[in-house]
Amino acid sequence: MKLWKTASRFLPLSFLTLFLTGCLGEENLTALDPKGPQAQWIYDNMILSIIVMALVSIVVFAIFFIILAKYRRKPGDDEIPKQVHGNTALEITWTVIPIILLVILAVPTITGTFMFADKDPDPEVGDNTVYIKVTGHQFWWQFDYENEGFTAGQDVYIPVGEKVIFELHAQDVLHSFWVPALGGKIDTVPGITNHMWLEADEPGVFKGKCAELCGPSHALMDFKLIALERDEYDAWVEGMSAEVEEPTETLANQGRQVFEENSCIGCHAVGGTGTAAGPAFTNFGEREVIAGYLENNDENLEAWIRDPQSLKQGNVMPAYPDMSEEDMEALIAYLRSLKVME
C-alpha cells in the first residue's frame, strides 16, 4: 500500500514530463528535422539506436513476464525447483547477440566519425569553397569570411548544397557552436583551433546556439545561419565586400555622426571601418533579431542602447541612458539604413 501511495504521487509527474516533450519551441531549432547530410546521419543513427533498444527491451520484458506468470510460486507449492548451474547454449546466445547489436551500431558510427573528420574541400566546388572563421565571445558570435575579406556578426550566411569549412576559436571562455538542423556541436576553446564542416540541403534560416554554459547570458547566445542559393549568396558577398555608402536620408546621416561621436565605431565595424570588439554592423538593418534574441524593432533597439545589462547580463556593451531622443531617433535610423541586399 505504501509503495502504491508513493507511486501515485510521482505518476502525474511522469505524464507531465511526457507532455512537456511537445514544448519544442522554434521549429528551426531541432535535430529531429534534419536539413543537411550531417544532421541526417545523426538522425538516422538515433532512429537505429532507438529501434535496437526497443527490440532488446521488448524481448527482455517479454521473457521476464512469461517467466513471472508461468513459474511463479503457487500457494501450497513447497517443492524445490530443479537447480541449474549453467547452460552453455544460453550463455553463448546472450553473448553473441549483444556483440551483433554492437557491431550494427558501431559500423555507421565509425563511418560517420570519419565523414565528419573530413575537412577537405568539395572537389566539385574547388577554389570556391567557403571558409569561415568562427569566434565565440561572451555572448555573441563573430564570423570572419577570410577569403572574401570581411566580417559578419550574429548572422552567418552559406551557399546551399556546398560543404562549408568552419574554423572555430574562443575569445574568452569555453563555448560550443551548434546548428541542430544541420549537424552536431563542437566546442570553441581559448587557445585551441577546432574545425568542422556543415552543408545545407535547402535554402532557409536555421537557428544556432551556444551549447556550453559560458556565463550569465549563455541561454541568450543565439545566432542564425542563413542558407542561400549560390547566386544570392554571391550577391550578399558582393554587398558585404563593397564600400559602405553614406546614407541618403538626412536623419540617417545625422545618425551616422551620432554613431561616430559616441565611439560606437570603436567596437562595431561597418564595412571595412571599425574593429571587431563587438558584432559587425555592415548589414544590421537586415537582421531579424538584435542581441541574439530580441526582435529587431525600434523599441527593443532603444532599450538595448540605453541599458544593455537589463536585457543581457554580463555583456560588455556600454550603456547610453542619457542619450537625447533626437540623437536616439537618428542613430536608429542610421542602423536601419545599413543593408547590403535589395
Swiss-Prot record:
<dbReference type="GO" id="GO:0005507">
    <property type="term" value="F:copper ion binding"/>
</dbReference>
<dbReference type="InterPro" id="IPR034236">
    <property type="entry name" value="CuRO_CcO_Caa3_II"/>
</dbReference>
<keyword id="KW-1278">Translocase</keyword>
<keyword id="KW-0812">Transmembrane</keyword>
<feature type="binding site">
    <location>
        <position position="214"/>
    </location>
    <ligand>
        <name>Cu cation</name>
    </ligand>
</feature>
<keyword id="KW-0449">Lipoprotein</keyword>
<feature type="binding site">
    <location>
        <position position="210"/>
    </location>
    <ligand>
        <name>Cu cation</name>
    </ligand>
</feature>
<feature type="signal peptide">
    <location>
        <begin position="1"/>
        <end position="22"/>
    </location>
</feature>
<comment type="function">
    <text>Subunits I and II form the functional core of the enzyme complex. Electrons originating in cytochrome c are transferred via heme a and Cu(A) to the binuclear center formed by heme a3 and Cu(B).</text>
</comment>
<feature type="domain" description="Cytochrome c">
    <location>
        <begin position="250"/>
        <end position="342"/>
    </location>
</feature>
<dbReference type="Pfam" id="PF02790">
    <property type="entry name" value="COX2_TM"/>
</dbReference>
<keyword id="KW-1133">Transmembrane helix</keyword>
<keyword id="KW-0479">Metal-binding</keyword>
<feature type="binding site" description="covalent">
    <location>
        <position position="264"/>
    </location>
    <ligand>
        <name>heme c</name>
    </ligand>
</feature>
<keyword id="KW-0349">Heme</keyword>
<feature type="lipid moiety-binding region" description="S-diacylglycerol cysteine">
    <location>
        <position position="23"/>
    </location>
</feature>
<dbReference type="InterPro" id="IPR011759">
    <property type="entry name" value="Cyt_c_oxidase_su2_TM_dom"/>
</dbReference>
<dbReference type="GO" id="GO:0005886">
    <property type="term" value="C:plasma membrane"/>
</dbReference>
<feature type="binding site">
    <location>
        <position position="175"/>
    </location>
    <ligand>
        <name>Cu cation</name>
    </ligand>
</feature>
<keyword id="KW-0249">Electron transport</keyword>
<feature type="binding site">
    <location>
        <position position="218"/>
    </location>
    <ligand>
        <name>Cu cation</name>
    </ligand>
</feature>
<dbReference type="InterPro" id="IPR045187">
    <property type="entry name" value="CcO_II"/>
</dbReference>
<feature type="binding site" description="covalent">
    <location>
        <position position="267"/>
    </location>
    <ligand>
        <name>heme c</name>
    </ligand>
</feature>
<dbReference type="GO" id="GO:0042773">
    <property type="term" value="P:ATP synthesis coupled electron transport"/>
</dbReference>
<protein>
    <recommendedName>
        <fullName>Cytochrome c oxidase subunit 2</fullName>
        <ecNumber>7.1.1.9</ecNumber>
    </recommendedName>
</protein>
<feature type="binding site" description="axial binding residue">
    <location>
        <position position="268"/>
    </location>
    <ligand>
        <name>heme c</name>
    </ligand>
</feature>
<dbReference type="InterPro" id="IPR009056">
    <property type="entry name" value="Cyt_c-like_dom"/>
</dbReference>
<feature type="topological domain" description="Cytoplasmic">
    <location>
        <begin position="70"/>
        <end position="89"/>
    </location>
</feature>
<keyword id="KW-0679">Respiratory chain</keyword>
<keyword id="KW-0813">Transport</keyword>
<dbReference type="InterPro" id="IPR036257">
    <property type="entry name" value="Cyt_c_oxidase_su2_TM_sf"/>
</dbReference>
<feature type="transmembrane region" description="Helical">
    <location>
        <begin position="51"/>
        <end position="69"/>
    </location>
</feature>
<feature type="region of interest" description="Cytochrome c oxidase subunit II">
    <location>
        <begin position="23"/>
        <end position="249"/>
    </location>
</feature>
<keyword id="KW-0564">Palmitate</keyword>
<dbReference type="GO" id="GO:0004129">
    <property type="term" value="F:cytochrome-c oxidase activity"/>
</dbReference>
<dbReference type="InterPro" id="IPR036909">
    <property type="entry name" value="Cyt_c-like_dom_sf"/>
</dbReference>
<feature type="transmembrane region" description="Helical">
    <location>
        <begin position="90"/>
        <end position="108"/>
    </location>
</feature>
<dbReference type="Pfam" id="PF00034">
    <property type="entry name" value="Cytochrom_C"/>
</dbReference>
<dbReference type="Pfam" id="PF00116">
    <property type="entry name" value="COX2"/>
</dbReference>
<feature type="lipid moiety-binding region" description="N-palmitoyl cysteine">
    <location>
        <position position="23"/>
    </location>
</feature>
<dbReference type="InterPro" id="IPR001505">
    <property type="entry name" value="Copper_CuA"/>
</dbReference>
<keyword id="KW-0408">Iron</keyword>
